[in-house]
A protein has these predicted regions:
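Class I S-adenosyl-L-methionine
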Residues: 1-30, 34, 104, 118-138, ...
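Class I S-adenosyl-L-methionine-dependent methyltransferase module
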Residues: 27-123, 127-128
Length: 218
């Protein structure tokens, strides 16, 4: 992915920043997500917030019921100490011990954030993110027919319409999805294993794809 003339990379659904942390060659990186506790966690770690190495199940339950006491900690526990990284989707344990996932999640997050020290983290709806002219835009939305953090579904028709608008107004747009409308072309794909729950038999493979908009030719 080559940096555009303006040198700005904008992620509209940054999540855990697995992709964003590997982006290089840009003078400015903007990471957005509508989940305020997630952004509080990322901003906190960026500013030196000390994450815990252990989180007990009792602490997990307490934080789940008192989310606003410490939003950065809530973001970390809600995702990093939950099964499969699902927002407060159940206290996660190591298979071979009764410890939480906190230490491993902390290590992974600190490694991710090591390359994002100068990134700008913002919390907005994806349509409200200020995008500098000529930016590279990356969107990794919730998959079609799945629910987001709060149980809401993304309006996929509206999403793709907005991606077209961004591309048609001078931005370079990349979308990570399983499928896309015909006017978006797949430029990369890879099979990935997924899981619905703790049951190993429920794991399955799907093909993750990267699409970009094909501007109409005259």
């Amino acid at each position: 992915m080559l940096p555009p003339p303006c040198g700005v990379f904008v992620s509209l659904f940054c999540g855990s920043c697995a992709v964003e942390s590997k982006v290089q060659g840009f003078s400015r990186i903007i990471c957005n997500d509508k989940h305020r506790y997630l952004i509080a966690m990322l901003q906190g770690v960026q500013g030196g917030y000390e994450l815990p190495d252990t989180v007990s199940e009792a602490e997990y339950r307490y934080i789940r019921e008192h989310k606003d006491d410490d939003p950065a900690l809530t973001g970390f526990v809600g995702f990093g100490c939950s099964f499969g990284g699902k927002w407060f989707g159940g206290y996660a344990r190591d298979r071979h011990s009764d410890r939480s996932y906190a230490a491993g999640s902390k290590k992974t997050l600190l490694q991710t954030m090591a390359t994002l020290g100068d990134a700008e983290f913002i919390c907005n709806d994806y349509r409200a993110v200020p995008v500098p002219q000529g930016a590279v835009i990356y969107a990794d939305p919730p998959y079609r027919n799945t629910t987001g953090y709060g149980g809401e579904k993304l309006d996929t028709d509206e999403f793709w319409t907005y991606m077209r608008l961004l591309a048609q107004t001078g931005h370079t747009v990349f979308v990570s999805e399983l499928e896309a409308p015909d006017d978006f072309v797949c430029i990369w794909e890879k099979p990935v294993q997924r899981s619905l729950d703790r049951n190993v038999s429920n794991r399955f493979f799907s093909t993750e794809k990267l699409f970009t908009y094909a501007l109409p030719t005259e």
